[in-house]
Amino acid sequence: TPIKSSAASDVYKRQILQYVQAGQEGGNAFADVVSGDVTPSGKMTDTWAKDYYDYPGAEVYSYKSGDLMKEKYEEGIFVGYRYFDTFEVPVRYSFGYGMSYTDFEIRTNDIKVSGRGMMNPKVSVTVTVTNTGDTYAGKEVVQIYASCPQGRLVKEFRRLAVFGKTKLLAPKESQTMTITFPLYQLTSYEEESASWILEPGMYGIWIG
C-alpha cells in the first residue's frame, strides 16, 4: 500500500514507532518498548516514499487509468524496493530500515557456494554481529542482498536473498552466525523459454 510520510516526518524529526495490529498483548509490548525494557529490532517490510507520486503506480491508480474495475501493474520486475533501488529514487524510509536503542557491528567472515546442479547448490554467508552499545541488550537482523549481472535479461539493481536474526545480545557481546540461501534465488525468468536462468557474469553480495 503506498504511504505518504512527508507530514509525519515533518512533525516527528527523530523517530516513529509503527504500531499496527499488535493483538491482545499489544499494550504490554508497546509499554515494554517505550519504557526501554525491550529494544526494538523490527525492520521495514516495504518502502516509504517521500511523496505519493514517487510510487511508480501512482499515475495510473484507480480512476487515473480510466478503469475503476481493473488495476494494471506496469512496474514489471521493479516492484517495491526494487524500483526505488534500481532507479535511485530518494525515499523517506527504505525497505529493511529499522532503528534500535543500541548499535551493532556486522563483520563478514566468509562467503562460499556449495553443492552441484541448479536445485542443490547454496550460498552460505558467515558473519559476526557485535552489540557495540554500552547500555541496552538487543537483537539485530542481518540482511543479505544480491546483485546479478546485467546480461540479456533485465534485472533489478539488487534483491533480498535471505535474512537472519541474532539472539538477544548484551552490550559488547558477539554472535557468529551462518545464513544460507539456495543458488536459484539468483536466477531470472526468461519468457521465451519459460525457464529460470542463471546468467554468467559477476554477482555481488551485500551484507547489512
Question: Where do the PLM segments sit?
Answer:
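Active-site-adjacent elements of ketosynthase-type condensing enzymes
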Residues: E59-D67
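Residues embedded in well-ordered beta-strands within globular domains across many folds
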Residues: Y12, L17, T45-W48, D110, ...
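Acidic, His- and aromatic-enriched active-site or binding-groove loops in soluble protein domains
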Residues: Q15-G27
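Acidic/polar loop patches that form or flank catalytic/metal-binding clefts of enzymes
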Residues: E25, T39-A58, V79-G80, P90-Y93, ...
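Glycine-rich beta-alpha loop elements in corrinoid/cobalamin-binding modules
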Residues: F30
